[in-house]
């Protein structure tokens, strides 16, 4: 997966965590019932605006609200977690699909880049949170035991909230996909 350089340390941390974790869950709201539905998604790229790009079949998006989606990535072995709230847009551009194509997508899109329903789903970050302990299970278990014995908070890892800047919302799609 290609990860572009981000404009701040926190945004870069989020991009790196998502890249390291790999597959995440995307949650969208059903327009008719209001129910939330989730499915696993494998990111293809994280662009310079911390937008996450995926392949999907266009028909799988019918009936879902794309103006508010959630992406959740979890790596319990390393106590790393990311939650991204954003807006999704569908990109039908063949050049973008070709640029992002990977043989890993072949099981879902048998016809390759020419698959008639293949689109890129680009989720633009509005806000995100991450938790990262960046330590082994043994260290975390020791820290928890110490915390219980000492009666003090565990204080293990980092939790941050990040929101995008307004300037991100005005860049052209052409520049992002070039």
Where are the predicted features?
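Active-site-proximal "nucleotidyltransferase
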Residues: 1-25
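C-terminal edge-of-domain segments
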Residues: 2, 116-178
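N-terminal "first-domain core" detector
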Residues: 10, 44-45
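A short, Trp-centered hydrophobic/proline-enriched beta-strand micro-motif
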Residues: 16-33, 69-73
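A positional/architectural concept
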Residues: 32-41
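Short active-site oxyanion
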Residues: 48-52
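Short His-Asn-centered micro-motif
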Residues: 55-57
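Short, structured beta-strand-loop surface elements
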Residues: 62-127
């Amino acid at each position: 997966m290609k990860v572009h350089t981000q404009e701040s340390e926190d945004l870069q941390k989020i991009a790196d965590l998502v890249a390291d974790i790999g597959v995440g869950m995307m949650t969208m709201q059903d327009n008719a019932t209001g129910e939330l539905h989730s499915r696993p998604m494998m990111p293809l790229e994280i662009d310079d605006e911390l937008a996450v790009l995926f392949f999907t079949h266009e028909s799988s998006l019918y009936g879902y609200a794309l103006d508010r989606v959630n992406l959740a990535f979890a790596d319990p072995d390393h106590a790393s977690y990311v939650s991204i709230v954003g807006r999704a847009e569908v990109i039908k551009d063949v050049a973008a699909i070709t640029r992002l194509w990977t043989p890993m997508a072949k099981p879902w899109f048998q016809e390759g880049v020419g698959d008639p329903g293949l689109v890129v789903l680009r989720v633009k970050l509005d806000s995100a949170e991450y938790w990262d302990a960046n330590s082994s299970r043994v260290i975390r278990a020791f820290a928890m035991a110490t915390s219980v014995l000492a009666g003090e908070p565990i204080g293990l890892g980092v939790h941050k909230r990040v929101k995008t800047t307004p300037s991100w919302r005005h860049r052209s799609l052409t520049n992002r996909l070039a």
